[in-house]
Swiss-Prot record:
Lineage of origin: Bacteria, Pseudomonadati, Pseudomonadota, Alphaproteobacteria, Rhodobacterales
Entry's localization field: Cytoplasm
Pfam families: GIY-YIG, HHH_5, UVR, UvrC_RNaseH, UvrC_RNaseH_dom
Protein encoded by which gene: uvrC
Membrane-crossing residue ranges in chain numbering: none
Domain UVR residues, every copy: 215-250
Function according to Swiss-Prot or TrEMBL: The UvrABC repair system catalyzes the recognition and processing of DNA lesions. UvrC both incises the 5' and 3' sides of the lesion. The N-terminal half is responsible for the 3' incision and the C-terminal half is responsible for the 5' incision.
Keywords, ordered alphabetically: Cytoplasm, DNA damage, DNA excision, DNA repair, Excision nuclease, SOS response
Record InterPro entries: GIY-YIG_endonuc, GIY-YIG_endonuc_sf, GIY-YIG_UvrC_Cho, Hlx-hairpin-Hlx_DNA-bd_motif, RuvA_2-like, UVR_dom, UVR_dom_sf, UvrABC_protein_C
Main localization (coarse): cytoplasm
Residue ranges occupied by any GIY-YIG domain in the UniProt entry: 28-105
Gene Ontology molecular function: any one: excinuclease ABC activity
PANTHER family documented for this protein: UVRABC SYSTEM PROTEIN C (PTHR30562:SF1), UVRC/OXIDOREDUCTASE (PTHR30562)
Name of the protein: UvrABC system protein C
GO biological process: nucleotide-excision repair; SOS response
Amino acid sequence: MQDTNPSQPDSPITGYACIQDYLRNLSGAPGVYRMLDAQARVLYVGKARNLKARVSNYARPGHSPRIERMIRETASMMFLTTRTETEALLLEQNLIKQLKPKYNVLLRDDKSFPNILVAKDHSFAQIKKHRGAKKEKGTYFGPFASAGAVNRTLNQLQKAFLLRNCTDAVFESRTRPCLLYQIKRCSAPCVGLISDQDYAAAVKDAERFLSGRSTRVQEELAEQMMAASEAMEFERAAALRDRIRALTTVQGTQGINPRGVAEADVVALHLENGQACVQVFFIRANQNWGNRDFYPRVGEDVSAAEVMEAFLGQFYDNKEPPRQLILSDAIENADLMTEALSEKAGRKVELLVPQRGEKAELVSGALRNARESLARRMSESATQTKLLGGLAEAFDLDGPPQRIEVYDNSHIQGTNAVGGMIVAGPEGFLKNQYRKFNIRGDDLTPGDDFGMMKEVLTRRFTRLLKEDPDRDKGLWPDLLLIDGGAGQVSAVHEIMMAHGVQDIPMVGVAKGIDRDHGKEEFHRTGQRPFALKRNDPVLYFIQRLRDEAHRFAIGTHRAKRAKAVSATPLDDIPGVGAARKRALLAHFGSAKAVSRADLADLTAVEGVSAGLAQKIYDFFHES
């Protein structure tokens, strides 16, 4: 990859003239180009087999209104040459996600998806939910469309196969069965109530079920149930019946389970009125692991082929593609996309646009889902627009806010204090922009809510002024909502003045005298408190915003508290991370036992070198 930017034009020309000026020295190599406006903001990122030929297209008239606007705004360009067009495609999608150009199709929600992991770093395998890099030893099944889908499947698998989900440290410390054994969700291998061989057989059955051999597993359980019934072992027969029902429940929640599709993602696109919905169904081992809808940002005159190609490039930028992608719409550069995805996966990846048969039926079903999801979203968007207009009227704003930030704190008598910020706008809650703040102030009095809010807003505005001083990146709020009354509003106003931020409206939302929903009072600097009518839709909207901020802050606080509860002296030893901590606790059972271990015992733990063993030993034995 090489930066080959021709010298910028001397005069501040824009549009067609600017592009023609760059063409004079541009090479015919493959690569990526960027179009920038007069403020050097990236307008568009594109790839090309031949940069000179591709950019010359922009120098000729006859483009769509969207592209014409982009050309008029173009004041400069940047170029990167690559060895191959495939490399250019991968770089293009990476830059689009990073720079979020104004005129590109942009996938806005791009989280990783959870898997089920059968962890095999212990003699009794653990079954659990896993998200992120696949570094742990074991077998992975997925991806699943959501954490809820994983949790439901895990719940039923525990009923069917009685596998443990506890951590190794908890497993080693048990002296009697836990509650999961009592409710028939675990076979209690921790206290020896099942043999190694029987537990391994249960793990194997669970893996067979998740690998698509579910029918055979159920048939074997049914045979065992009949044999137990004939032997008049009715309690065992009933237990086997319940296990079969649990597996049937898993299959029932999966909807369609295609027989002729072993490993594929079904990707269906619906475009309407300048908006798009992409439905992705995840099919692995002939089983449907759920579906997710995505709403990429598109222009009013963009084609289905362009949206589909951009979606595939960005979606699989940080995910391993399956063996087949079954698409609703063909893309222009299908061969190039196939080559890029195959290179990423390290094996062949097929792109299919089926016209008949089972695969076409899958696409048809996904398209129906996409149409219905987009219709709901457009309806909700219209309602949201109306509510934002009502909010502007209620608080005397210049116009409907496009970005609302809501803040709340959570703590227990000042301990594990956190602040939470949620963001909402015309498209609803923008969860990928939520932020949490661990309260750092050592000089704060425990429970000082005013001081905590001051710290949170100080950090927020300090960062905003650093990252977006010109307010042109869409990071600044149009409205701040604070959970609290006059005192909170005064504290936040003080912070805003200190940072020179005087033009952002701020409202404190305080519960009324009886602290009841519907009796909220609203506080603004220099104004008397006021209320909205109990049946005002805007009031319900504000309550939803406040409750979401409260939920997020409490959830963050609970996670921090849980982490603090599980903290041990091992956390303070340099070189002992999460994996080595787990290994030490699994080997010794507790941090106290680790502190008593000698060097020979410590080096016997997997992943602990002689040098690290010495550090651990010295940590516990220094005077």
